Amino acid sequence: MKAITLRQPAGLENLRLVDLPDPGQPGAGEIRVRVHASSLNFHDLGVVTGRMPSADGRIPMSDGAGVVEAVGEGVDEFAVGDAVVSRFFPSWLDGGPTIADFATVPGDGVDGYARDTVVRPAHWFTHAPRGYSHAEAATLTTAGLTAWRALVVDARLKAGDTVLVLGTGGVSIFALQFAKHMGATVIATSSSDEKLARAQALGADFTINYRRDTDWAAKVLDCTNGRGVDVVIEVGGPDTLGQSIQACRIGGHIALIGVLTGIAGQVPTVALMQRHQTLQGLIVGSRSHQRDMVRALDATGIKPVVDQTFALEDIADAFAHQAAGKHFGKLCLSI
């Protein structure tokens, strides 16, 4: 079996292409999956660069998509030949979150999907949307489901609402697409006019270059006639949260998803209180959420934006490209 392992000390130079024993046939309740694609997330980047400690020899990548090759006894949800996509929190099936760490997350606490074959419990997967390539399906595990949960489950977005998406990475572009299909107005930010033009082509109603307009919260208020947005997709963290609060309407919802500007910082609590806003942290979602999202994608025909696909053996180059921040949407691996 072809796989990538991460040797310690972590770093892109310590990602190794290796041959490992075949995982064998599935036992009761398990499926064997030929993995064809994965997609890169900043969580994965944190693991492979050592910002998030992992075991020596860990197989990285939390996202995986492929085809069922065999099913174990008692599995009736999947059949040989089904296209499937992995899940971020394998044990979170339904209901509210009960997990606050990454001990069970593939590519972090357990081995991930940078390999060509896995045998896993069937509930670690859902069906992939109809008509999706494996690379497109792989983008759903983390980025797609995070955007879905933020807008649909937590913020309860409805037609006529206004959404602010920060940046043009995987989660933000999914949020833009989901919000537009739900009848919302979308404001997108980026430091690149080229990326903003691409966001506009996807349906963004307003665009703001935050490098040129450093007081971008004021620009958001201009776009909303002083009201502010109903929902903010906040991926920046401490350096952007203050302006996100100012850009959000009184009683609005801020989905705290990313920490691109740092893992800790001051929270303007008085402004948050005065504006009666909900600040909700979240990390991905449950199996039930993912199945709901897949049904919605089947119904709407929304397709992810895959910026570039790298071969598995070029995984270090893929992460270097991600770290440079030049991509729009998702980066994927072909396995």
Predicted segments with their positions:
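Adenosine-nucleotide cofactor-binding segment
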Residues: 162-168, 180-243
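NAD(P)H dinucleotide-binding glycine-rich loop of Rossmann-like/cofactor-binding domains
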Residues: 89-166
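N-terminal Rossmann-fold NAD(P) dinucleotide-binding loop
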Residues: 172-173
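Glycine-rich phosphate-binding loop and adjacent beta-alpha segment
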Residues: 102-103, 235-305, 335
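Glycine-rich beta-strand-centered segment in the early N-terminal region that forms part
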Residues: 23-38, 48-93, 109-112, 129-132
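Short N-terminal strand-loop motif that marks the start
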Residues: 1-65, 120, 320-323, 334
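C-terminal hydrophobic helical "lid"/dimerization subdomain
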Residues: 1, 7, 242, 287-335
